[in-house]
């Protein structure tokens, strides 16, 4: 669910997921269109694509379990959907951490009106 995803983001980046990622660029937050603005926004685009492959699952509300082993996120027990949602969220949280150096404040609270280019394919 969004709660676990938020906790993962906080653990991986040290950033508050709501204030830092909820409306970043063209793809972070609800919906998405246009060309991702940078690598962090591309993390969100890939995350949206990952969720899009999970037919019959409810990524925003399905609760899943994860733990850490030697600092790494490990998706734990649960249904197929729960495990797949966890893997999508894990990949995005790691992507955010790997792109912290290029995170741009100018893309925080970015208006979707600036996202008019053709959207890339997943």
Swiss-Prot record:
Membrane-traversing stretches: none
GO biological process: arachidonate secretion; lipid catabolic process; negative regulation of T cell proliferation; phospholipid metabolic process
Tissue specificity comment: Expressed by the venom gland.
EC number, as in UniProt: 3.1.1.4
Classification via Gene3D superfamilies: Phospholipase A2 domain (1.20.90.10)
Domain of life: Eukaryota
Keyword Cell membrane set for record: no
Annotated catalysed reactions: a 1,2-diacyl-sn-glycero-3-phosphocholine + H2O = a 1-acyl-sn-glycero-3-phosphocholine + a fatty acid + H(+)
Principal EC category: hydrolase
Names of the cofactor(s): Ca(2+)
Positions of disulphide bridges: 26-115, 28-44, 43-95, 49-122, 50-88, 57-81, 75-86
Residues that coordinate or bind Ca(2+): 27, 29, 31, 48
Key words of the record: Blood coagulation cascade inhibiting toxin, Calcium, Disulfide bond, Hemostasis impairing toxin, Hydrolase, Lipid degradation, Lipid metabolism, Metal-binding, Secreted, Toxin
Note accompanying the cofactor annotation: Binds 1 Ca(2+) ion.
Annotated catalytic residues: 47, 89
Biological role stated in the UniProt entry: Snake venom phospholipase A2 that induces fast and sustaining local edema a few hours after injection (5-10 ug) in the hind paw, and prolongs the coagulation time of human plasma. Exhibits moderate hydrolytic activities and prefers the zwitterionic micelles (dPPC with Triton X-100) to the anionic micelles (dPPC with deoxycholate). PLA2 catalyzes the calcium-dependent hydrolysis of the 2-acyl groups in 3-sn-phosphoglycerides.
Family: Belongs to the phospholipase A2 family. Group II subfamily. D49 sub-subfamily.
Protein name, UniProt field: Basic phospholipase A2 Ts-G6D49
Native organism: Trimeresurus stejnegeri (Chinese green tree viper)
Lineage: Eukaryota, Metazoa, Chordata, Craniata, Vertebrata
